[in-house]
Amino acid sequence: MILHFGRPLKLPYFVHTFPQELRLFMAIYTLDDKRTSILLIGGSRHTAEMAIRLRDHEIPFTIFLSFDDAHMFAFGDSPALPPYLIPFSSSIVTSIADVTIPPDIIMDCQPLAAELKVPLIHEVIEEFPLAIILCSTLACTATEIMHYIQDSHNVIGFGFLPGHTGSASTIELSKALNASELALNKIEQVMNATGYTCEVVEDRVGLVMPRILATLMNEAAFAVLENIATKEDIDAAMKTGVNYPHGLLEWADTIGLDTVLSMLDALYAEYRQERYRPCILFRQYVRARWIGKAGGKGFYTYASGYA
């Protein structure tokens, strides 16, 4: 089922025998672009940050959160919405059957390895096979997601950095090797509508800016571990000496140490290069749930947090 000017429209049975490219063309161009609908999946804070961006730009969305999502049990033994998702409670469904508007785009903002993303993506695309999949590729590639799905779904990757989206004006996109240019163009349109300028890059783990930034943060963490300087001095040196907008350790806290660790683990697994080996401080801090600003503590201590 697709939408035509906001109304459900059933395709004739024979349409499902058309090539994927033609079906995608029909799905996209029978839609009024102003009514493009997005289904956000997963209960992480990254989902909440993208929801804020979509809401602020008046783009309709629904959040699908399964009852067995780990984030539902992060604050007790009974399932409950994490605090950061409470403002969007009216947009959250816990059953695919409750998604009233078939989405044009399924958006997964979580910086997880592909094998951790795929079960939820599978569950959703079985119900909405015409949707384009827009997937965070901080810890995987779009082609890897397409490989796991084992179908001709169009998968586009993007470099969504939590804690960075509010001020960011550019976002990186990557196309799975088998995905269509049509799908990429559609995603560019939607990202432009949310205030982003898009840069299309090769489909690699971490893309460009997130990958380089994570590597720099890792080096800063090693400098702390080796007592080369205090964390304050390291951050001050990068802000005043290199003119970075934030110190690297402060920046890591803002993005989330768990996110940085996820990127570094994925880069090290992909390339086996020493420069991507995560500093043990990242792993130890994440084990202690010191994930940065979101948790109230990371390299620095903060007044509030919800992790």
Which stretches of residues belong to each language-model region?
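Active-site-proximal catalytic alpha-helix in oxidoreductases
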Residues: 164-175, 185-186, 192-194, 202-226, ...
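Helix N-cap / loop-to-helix initiation motif
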Residues: 180, 229-233
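Short phosphate-binding/catalytic loops that engage adenosine nucleotides
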Residues: 59, 196, 229
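Conserved binding/recognition cores within well-folded domains
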Residues: 2-3, 220
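NAD(P)+-binding Rossmann beta1-loop-alpha1 motif at the extreme N-terminus of oxidoreductases
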Residues: 3-6, 13-14, 18-19, 24-94, ...
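Rossmann-fold dinucleotide-binding core
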Residues: 32, 48, 110, 118-122, ...
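Rossmann-like NAD(P)-binding element
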Residues: 79-132
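Interdomain hinge/lid region at the active-site interface
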Residues: 236-239, 243-307
